[in-house]
Design a protein with these regions (language model features):
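Acidic, polar-rich N-terminal leader regions of halophilic archaeal proteins
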Residues: 1-115
């Protein structure tokens, strides 16, 4: 699955939730995703982190190979709100059933860096 296909598949599911992918690229084994959130307030909305993460997990069934994920979150006014990450190892462990939904979510939430 190339970057254009991956971006399209992410956008299809996320736009209805107020998450707008603004940039997506793969570089040296890392998926970089930038998106804007329509959610009010400051910081990184945890619910939207979950939505992006769940969509990536669903794409594993469609042939996407897990990569380290680095995400940057901005407001629709383009103000940086923060960043988060998910390691490829965590995604693969979840896919194998070795890491629960709760444990994966907690690991990712723990990586959030507010702007």
């Amino acid at each position: 699955m190339d970057d254009a296909d991956l971006r399209e598949r992410l956008e299809q599911r996320l736009m209805s939730h107020g998450v707008y992918v603004t940039d997506l690229s793969t570089d040296d084994g890392t998926l970089h995703v930038a998106y804007e959130t329509a959610s009010p307030g400051d910081g990184v909305p945890h619910r939207e982190v979950g939505r992006v993460l769940n969509r990536l997990l669903a794409l594993l069934d469609e042939g996407w190979e897990p990569l380290d994920v680095r995400a940057e979150v901005s407001s629709i006014e383009e103000d940086l709100r923060g960043a988060w990450r998910a390691d490829a190892e965590w995604l693969a462990a979840h896919d194998r059933g070795d890491l629960s939904d709760v444990d994966l979510s907690q690991r990712v939430i723990d990586t959030i860096e507010e702007a």
